[in-house]
Amino acid sequence: EGVFPGVYPSFSREHQLFQIASKVEEAAWAEALMGVALDRAAVLLVLTLLPERSEALFGLRGYRYALLEAGYAAGLVLLAAVGQGLAAYPAETFHDEGVARLLGLPEGEYPGVVVVLGR
């Protein structure tokens, strides 16, 4: 409730969403997600990676850990969504650069997993 269409990054330290764009570019998202059906999607959840941060903690394995963590988080989101009666599936293919541009990701942050949620 109270969430309007747009792009909302989550800031984990503040535990809040902040709207950074009020317009959702549906055609651009469809292209970036390589034809994934979005007609019934209410939410696209994009879990991003910060490999440099993970590598600072874990060395060369950090990049792999970042990918694994995104996958684990996506799995938990999928389980929770189904438990709430929502349709949920991971977008298996997408253009990294297109998704990053639509989200306005800074250099060094990359989309790892896109989860489509709806009814």
Please name every model-derived segment.
Residues 1-119:
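Acidic, surface-exposed loops and disordered segments
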